[in-house]
A protein has these predicted regions:
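Single conserved hydrophobic/aromatic residue that forms the stacking wall/gate
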Residues: 168-177
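Intrinsically disordered, low-complexity coil segments
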Residues: 23-31, 87-96
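Catalytic cores of NTP-dependent nucleotidyl/adenyl transfer enzymes across multiple folds
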Residues: 114, 141-169
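Long, hydrophobic, amphipathic alpha-helical segments used as structural scaffolds
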Residues: 26, 50-58, 112-119, 163-166
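Conserved catalytic core of two-metal-ion nucleotidyltransferases
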Residues: 48, 98-146
């Protein structure tokens, strides 16, 4: 637990320093954009450390979604992440995978990251986004934080194909490239 406390203290200190610098300079719009990217980077670096510490399987990916996916983390916003699993993976209760996932999410909270997390396969992401526009929008603004880049690329390919197809069916007069 000592390592988590050290990570928490470093995260809090670095975040406080960024916010203090912004307040001291009376940041302009451009300055605020830089701050949002720096806060996003700070959270992303901590997530990468926690991901490695959790020793999650190599076939998984940690994906930033929503504002965090845009690389714009507002000072008091939660950090929205998707723990992306390959299709056919089900973290059953009591399984080693589920234990590792719960440990990773718990470590995030223990270090001061207020995360909003979902654990889904690519197929589950597609199904959820087809039925919920908030999920669809959140996934639209996604980027890989760490983990399996090929899985993330496959998710993006399928998600974009579904989203463009759905949008075109809904708005048939809209031109698409």
């Amino acid at each position: 637990m000592t390592e988590l406390h050290a990570l928490r203290d470093a995260y809090r200190s670095d975040k406080a320093a960024l916010l203090a610098a912004m307040k001291a300079t009376g940041a302009s719009t451009r300055g605020i954009r830089v701050l949002l990217r720096k806060l996003s980077s700070l959270a992303g670096n901590l997530l990468q450390t926690l991901w490695q510490r959790a020793q999650l399987p190599d076939d998984m990916a940690l994906v930033a979604v929503g504002g965090f996916g845009r690389d714009q983390l507002f000072p008091y916003s939660d950090v929205d992440v998707l723990l992306l699993l390959p299709d056919g993976t089900a973290p059953e209760a009591g399984s080693a995978l589920r234990t590792k996932l719960e440990g990773f999410i718990g470590s995030c909270w223990d270090t001061g990251l207020e995360i909003g997390s979902s654990v889904r396969t690519v197929a589950e992401c597609l199904a959820e986004s087809a039925g919920d526009v908030t999920v669809q929008t959140s996934l639209l603004e996604s980027r890989l934080v760490c983990g399996n880049a090929a899985l993330f690329a496959e998710f993006q390919r399928q998600y974009r194909a579904q989203t463009v197809s759905y949008t075109h069916l809904t708005l048939p007069t809209t031109p698409y490239v």
